[in-house]
Amino acid sequence: MATIEQLGAEKYVLLTTFRRDGRAVSTPLWVVPDGAGLAFWTPAGTGKVKRIRNSGRVTLAPCDVRGNSHGEAIEANARIGDSTDRRRIGEGLKRKYGLLGRLTLLGSKLRRGEDGTLAILVS
């Protein structure tokens, strides 16, 4: 079983959040290591943000770009970061994902502005 720190080195991680009725919703995404945990960047109005606000319970598993898991899932807790976290995680995504990361973050900033995107911290 992978640890959160090991998942931070993966290119894609499958994040599973849970609806109020307990149904799971999975999404593949980019992650960066963040201290003893990991973090990701997401638009503020997404379903995953609503579900994380409701309950910070998540699972994480290594996956490919299409969300096909290739390892065991681990339980974790997620929380929404502040603007300082958002800037730090954005820089981490640029370092880890290079030009594609920079272009993705620029597109997000142009579409949504500074406050349209959130950092989610997972531990």
What are these regions (language model features)?
Residues 10-44, 58-62, 71-75:
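Short beta-strand segments
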